[in-house]
Amino acid sequence: MSGKKSGLPDGRVPDRNPDGTPAVPWKSRWTEGPLPLWLVATAGGMAVMFVVGLFFYGSYVGVGSA
């Protein structure tokens, strides 16, 4: 974030200003800071499905295919 002083005890920047406007512009949310949780979960889910798919593929070809 951009050098804002925090009033919160753990040092976080508040999500909203006192007037209700967002403290960080929407564009900055995509270019600074951690990745959104939905993006991490989607990538992780796709990776898990890929690995499980490899196991199923391996059961039909190769050593375990009878």
Swiss-Prot record:
TM annotation in the entry: 37-57
Pfam families per the UniProt record, alphabetical: PsbJ (PF01788)
Sorted UniProt keywords: Membrane, Photosynthesis, Photosystem II, Reaction center, Thylakoid, Transmembrane, Transmembrane helix
Region (Disordered): 1-27
Compartments, as annotated in UniProt: Cellular thylakoid membrane
Superkingdom of this protein's organism: Bacteria
One example of a Gene Ontology biological process annotation: photosynthesis
Thylakoid in keyword set: yes
Record's bilayer topology term: Single-pass membrane protein
Keyword Cell membrane found: no
Subunit structure: PSII is composed of 1 copy each of membrane proteins PsbA, PsbB, PsbC, PsbD, PsbE, PsbF, PsbH, PsbI, PsbJ, PsbK, PsbL, PsbM, PsbT, PsbX, PsbY, PsbZ, Psb30/Ycf12, peripheral proteins PsbO, CyanoQ (PsbQ), PsbU, PsbV and a large number of cofactors. It forms dimeric complexes.
Role of this protein: One of the components of the core complex of photosystem II (PSII). PSII is a light-driven water:plastoquinone oxidoreductase that uses light energy to abstract electrons from H(2)O, generating O(2) and a proton gradient subsequently used for ATP formation. It consists of a core antenna complex that captures photons, and an electron transfer chain that converts photonic excitation into a charge separation.
Family: Belongs to the PsbJ family.
Protein name: Photosystem II reaction center protein J
Source organism (scientific name): Synechococcus sp. (strain RCC307)
